Amino acid sequence: MTAERHDMDKIGVTYHPKSDLARRCAGDIHARLEPMVREVWLASAWDDEAHEKHVRGTGLLLTCGGDGTVLRAARAVIPHPVTLLGVNLGRIGFLTEMTFEALMPRLEEIVGGAGRIETRAMLEAEMIRAGEEVRSGFHALNDVVVGRRTIGRTVQVTVRTDHTPIGNYRADGIIIATATGSTAYTLSVGGPILHPESRELLITPVAPHLAPANSVVLPGGSLVEVEIAEGQMGILSVDGQPDWDLGGGDVVKVRTSEHAARFLRLGPPGDFYLRVGRRLNWLSE
């Protein structure tokens, strides 16, 4: 679905702090925006304190880097309805909208209201241990992964949807992905590509032993539970962030978040398939 445009009086610019190019590009964008809007702020994408200070009331947040910078921004703006515009300085950039060179001549047009809002579902996850919630509030735009803790070994899990078992797996891991995440980790293990604005969830096993490797597509309102078998050790990874250790009997619950990511798009909706085709080398530029 397409959401309404947000107030453009306050705009933020973030950048990947380990990239000198991203820092320079963000500074140039910030300088260009200053005479155009009431307030513009600049921060490292890793500076959580700056985001907490500035994000309220921000209408647009430009991210300079790659998809990882966009993923971090999508989590950082929760619970505020901030629209994201990704400036691609990375490699593939499924989530980014345009290059720095393409952005600069269009900044005034963007501030003036050009484009449309694309709304994308996010995931929320929690950890249950001995029947008690031990960690909640994980949010992911791409995916939640329950994986093996040790290279060379598998992890044995039971996967349930809405409390009904759908499979026992001994595998490298289980990916629960959004439509956005369908072009990320799950794609690399043979999962399908979903339209970015669909709300379905994907469950995809990673290298399952003596079990089907097919993905399962679930309605957006589904609850997914992944339980670690007794005597097993695993990890929880949310959008590729630092892992959390899991042990036998631990359960990871995943559902669609009440928060959604908003992206500013300047091309028609069909551009998604063109972008995917080109970045996966299915189409020539």
Regions found by a protein language model. Name each.
Residues 1-60, 64, 101-116, 127-138:
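ATP/NTP phosphate-donor binding region
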Residues 16, 62, 66, 88, ...:
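A residue-level signal for conserved active-site and pocket-lining positions in enzyme catalytic cores
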Residues 22, 68-73, 182-188:
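Short glycine/serine/threonine-rich phosphate/pyrophosphate-binding segments
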Residues 61, 84, 174-175:
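Short, well-ordered beta-strand core segments
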Residues 72, 76-87:
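Gly/Ser-rich helix-loop-strand patches that form or flank binding pockets
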Residues 92-172:
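Catalytic core of DAGKc-family lipid kinases
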Residues 146, 162-165, 212-285:
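ATP/nucleoside-binding phosphotransfer catalytic cores, i.e., glycine-rich phosphate-binding loops
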Residues 164-212:
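Gly/Ser/Thr-rich active-site loops/lids in small-molecule metabolic enzymes
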